[in-house]
Amino acid sequence: MKGYSSKEIIKILLEDGWFEYSSATGSHHSFKHHTKKGRVVVPHPRKDLPIGTVKNIAKQAQIELI
């Protein structure tokens, strides 16, 4: 799995139908989906997210990253 920045992860989530549901006043952005359960929290801004964080975000969002 390649490394991702928080900006890239947010773009992927938005393309998959996730939307930001609370204003990002801190260092994290929260996303919800109309049909998928749960929420996804992305630390932002981060140039390079740790691989474990990226894997957890992908698992929570029910998406597959290359």
Residue map of PLM features:
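Basic nucleic-acid-binding interfaces
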Residues: 1-66
